């Protein structure tokens, strides 16, 4: 009986991969999967009514609370950078530094974007930066697929340090009550990953600019807002520096960075001005990630249900899963394309069930599993996949086809993912 139920679970898992790849509404898909797997778990004797009532559909979303707070604060911080003029000033300086070299200007804008998203988070922050960056890139004659692709890959480049996303992933990949702790070991890898990821962007820009000559004289004036003092431009990386050097937690780090931003940009002249700015940016920041939070809360229901039925799936899949860490990292690197369209290698989709199965079958620690699963999410899902909201926005804003966007970015994303899986094996599993 349990073998039959395990096969049914596997069929529903494959059906969900197909559903996610269409793409369809994932929030509803995750809810239906949680219902299905809970029901099958009841038949298999691994799930009780108490589990359904308390652990899956109540404990899943409510247990996500701390991570939701991190996401909201990351999104708010992104809005602070835009509203205070810090983001605009950094971008303007990058354009001036690039001079009459469109390719260099594109690379500098990508670097600025990557640094901003080491701390900022959310679709709203991406859009707010994108509406400044894209007109500059396009006015320089940079091809639209390259402008959209390099920008989206730059957003993903910063996410190796981004505590909003790192904590989001840690919450999703919890084993029981245990979560992966983001510490010095991860930050050492993040520095290497950032460098390799950004190098892939540079190579992508250089190769595409050779094929498509752009001219600096095509540049048009773009309003990026007021100038702020040079010291204020340290704000985007301040929370990361505080976390690495002084072990300051995410929320205090962001609060200190916000205070620093307000003081250095001259926004502390009156209490009412501070109140208006903080209130507006916080409201906008929460609005920006509302749907993201909804999706992630339904994902938690699915995660909890997957955890309850892992005993039915593990006996079927365990014999075919590699028991070698090197082979597992190698396979994830070779098949990272399966993170596309919420497939089996992204935890923000069908890959959540695979994580539960791999964790149960191998017994490997989170210190190994976390980088194994995070890399394809960060290099493929957040950078390139059209199901990621900000990627789809960039494609629409620049008016490029999904096909051209993918042709420009996917080869570099896949190579980057493979290299990073090999690096992660050396740093976390050897």
Can you name each region flagged by the protein language model?
Residues 2-17, 30-39, 44-45, 187-281, ...:
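Long, contiguous bundles of hydrophobic transmembrane helices that form the permeation core
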Residues 3-6, 61-68, 94-109, 140-147, ...:
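Membrane-interfacial loop-to-helix junctions in multi-pass transporters
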Residues 52-88, 274-311, 325-333, 337:
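Core transmembrane alpha-helical segments of multi-pass membrane transporters/permeases
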Residues 63-71, 184-198, 247-255, 367-379:
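Alpha-helical transmembrane segments
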Residues 1-73, 79-91, 95, 101-102, ...:
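N-terminal alpha-helical transmembrane segments of multi-pass membrane transport
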Residues 23-26, 64-67, 78-88, 117-128, ...:
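Short helix-coil transition sites and intra-membrane helix breaks within transmembrane domains
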Residues 70-73, 100-134, 322-367, 374-379:
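Hydrophobic alpha-helical transmembrane segments of multi-pass integral membrane proteins
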Residues 134-228, 390-430:
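Membrane-core helix-loop-helix motifs of multi-pass transport proteins
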């Amino acid at each position: 009986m349990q073998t039959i139920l395990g096969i049914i679970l596997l069929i529903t898992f494959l059906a969900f991969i197909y559903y996610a790849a269409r793409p369809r509404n994932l929030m509803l898909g995750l809810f239906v999967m949680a219902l299905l797997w809970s029901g099958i778990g009841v038949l298999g004797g691994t799930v009780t009514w108490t589990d359904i009532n308390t652990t899956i559909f109540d404990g899943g979303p409510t247990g996500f609370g701390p991570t939701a707070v991190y996401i909201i604060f990351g999104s708010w911080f992104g809005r602070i950078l835009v509203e205070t003029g810090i983001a605009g000033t950094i971008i303007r300086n990058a354009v001036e530094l690039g001079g009459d070299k469109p390719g260099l200007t594109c690379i500098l804008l990508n670097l600025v974007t990557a640094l901003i998203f080491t701390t900022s988070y959310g679709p709203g922050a991406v859009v707010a930066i994108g509406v400044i960056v894209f007109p500059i890139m396009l006015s320089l004659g940079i091809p639209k697929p390259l402008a959209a692709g390099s920008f989206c890959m730059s957003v993903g480049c910063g996410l190796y340090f981004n505590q909003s996303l790192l904590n989001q992933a840690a919450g999703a990949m919890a084993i029981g009550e245990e979560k992966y702790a983001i510490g010095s070991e991860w930050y050492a890898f993040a520095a290497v990953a950032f460098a390799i990821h950004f190098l892939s962007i540079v190579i992508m820009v250089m190769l595409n600019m050779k094929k498509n000559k752009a001219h600096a004289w095509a540049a048009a004036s773009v309003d990026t807002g007021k100038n702020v003092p040079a010291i204020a431009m340290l704000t985007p990386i301040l929370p990361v520096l505080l976390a690495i050097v002084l072990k300051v937690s995410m929320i205090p780090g962001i609060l200190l960075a916000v205070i620093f931003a307000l003081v250095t940009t001259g926004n502390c002249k009156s209490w009412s001005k501070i109140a208006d700015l903080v209130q507006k940016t916080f409201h906008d920041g929460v609005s920006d990630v509302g749907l993201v939070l909804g999706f992630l809360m339904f994902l938690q229901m699915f995660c909890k249900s997957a955890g309850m039925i892992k005993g039915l799936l593990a006996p079927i899949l365990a014999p075919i899963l590699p028991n070698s860490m090197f082979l597992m990292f190698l396979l994830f690197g070779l098949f990272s394309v399966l993170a596309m369209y919420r497939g089996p290698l992204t935890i923000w989709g069908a890959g959540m069930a695979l994580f539960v199965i791999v964790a149960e079958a191998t017994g490997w620690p989170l210190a190994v599993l976390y980088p194994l699963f995070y890399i394809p999410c960060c290099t493929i899902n957040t950078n390139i996949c059209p199901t990621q909201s900000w990627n789809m926005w960039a494609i629409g804003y620049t008016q490029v086809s999904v096909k051209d966007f993918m042709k420009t970015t996917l080869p570099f994303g896949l190579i980057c993912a493979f290299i990073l899986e090999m690096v992660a094996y050396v740093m976390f599993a050897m």
